[in-house]
A protein has these predicted regions:
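Short, flexible loop segments at boundaries between secondary-structure elements
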Residues: 144-152
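Short, well-ordered secondary-structure micro-motifs
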Residues: 18, 45-49, 102-105, 128-130
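Short glycine-rich anion-binding loops that position phosphate/pyrophosphate groups of nucleotides
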Residues: 41, 109, 121-124
């Protein structure tokens, strides 16, 4: 049924459940698997005038990018260890300086994936409104089915 799966993780405990499900599904279906983690660009406040804005120095940008790269490396190393433990082959991808939902949708499209697997934190009410939901954005903007793994009870 599914032959090319994109599995998204941010390294959180909730995402780990998504990784477990995605790995098991890819193994059961003998599907090609890409595991992706996305790190966002350094948030910059250009302000609305006067001296309210903050623009980072190049050193701050470089430091942030290095920290994101290190974090993404750990996230993907953890996913790699989980894949090796159950004998599932995968490709591993870090997309830096990107909006997660957009990067997930674009990667699924460019790699010809026919399923996206991701976990959701299950935020509700105002928390969801203000914090947003990458999963919701992928569901709305994606063109392939999305398997959503809920936060464990």
């Amino acid at each position: 049924m599914y032959t090319n799966i994109l599995l998204s993780t941010d390294g959180s405990d909730v995402a780990r459940k998504g990784v477990e499900h995605g790995l098991a599904l890819a193994k059961a279906l003998n599907a090609r698997l890409t595991i992706i983690t996305v790190t966002e660009a350094l948030p910059v406040d250009y302000g609305g005038g006067h001296a309210s804005g903050w623009i980072p120095t190049q050193e701050e940008v470089d430091s942030y990018d290095a920290a994101c790269k290190a974090r993404a490396g750990k996230v993907l190393d953890d996913a790699r260890a989980m894949a090796e433990q159950i004998g599932t082959a995968a490709e591993f991808l870090h997309v830096p300086n990107a909006h997660p939902a957009t990067a997930i949708v674009e990667t699924a499209k460019s790699r010809g994936c026919d399923l996206i697997v991701m976990a959701t934190h299950g935020r509700r009410g105002l928390r969801k409104l203000f914090l947003g939901s990458q999963t919701s954005e992928v569901l709305v903007n994606g063109s392939v089915p999305v398997l959503v793994v809920p936060k464990p009870a």
